[in-house]
């Protein structure tokens, strides 16, 4: 990929191109500590990609959920990736609890039970036209 958005994001992730940040007034989140609040504001200012990294127990999930929730007030969708299925499930659960429409992508056998109904496969299976689509597939 050259000269398109995918190529641009690839180059940013590889570190060959610097990411940009917008100038925004900081948003106050009184329920977060100062480090979490600063991280959420940094995510909100990111033009392209934001990474939240830290040791266990430092509030990354809380920070990410708030950042994602706030970003969804400004953008139509957000792609969230994590190092493990458990981390993705945990973030997804917290977002669902806040009323966010989550589509959980990944191997359904590695998704926890609570998040199964949010997987692509389950949504497809629950679609009203699924039986008809399945019968067409079986015939071919």
Put a short name on every predicted segment.
Residues 16-17, 21-25, 69, 77, ...:
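Conserved P-loop NTPase motor core of helicases/translocases
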Residues 1-17:
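Interdomain "pre-motor" coupling segment immediately N-terminal to P-loop NTPase/helicase cores
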Residues 13-22, 39, 52:
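Active-site cores of enzymes that catalyze phosphoryl transfer or operate on phosphate-rich substrates
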Residues 28-48, 62-63:
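N-terminal pre-P-loop "Q-motif" helix
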Residues 46-52, 75-76:
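Pre-Walker A (Motif I) flank of P-loop NTPase domains
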Residues 61-69:
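Motif I (Walker A/P-loop) of helicase-class P-loop NTPases
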């Amino acid at each position: 990929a050259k000269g398109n958005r995918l190529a641009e994001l690839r180059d940013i992730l590889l570190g060959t191109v610097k990411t940009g940040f917008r100038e925004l007034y900081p948003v106050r989140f009184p329920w977060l500590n100062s480090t979490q609040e600063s991280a959420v504001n940094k995510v909100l200012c990111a033009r392209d990609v934001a990474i939240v990294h830290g040791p266990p127990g430092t509030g990354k999930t809380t920070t990410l959920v708030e950042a994602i929730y706030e970003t969804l007030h400004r953008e139509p969708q957000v792609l969230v990736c994590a190092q493990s299925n458990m981390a993705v499930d945990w973030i997804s659960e917290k977002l669902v609890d806040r009323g966010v429409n989550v589509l959980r992508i990944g191997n359904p056998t590695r998704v926890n039970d609570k998040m199964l109904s949010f997987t692509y496969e389950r949504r497809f299976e629950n679609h009203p036209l699924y039986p008809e689509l399945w019968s067409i597939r079986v015939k071919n």
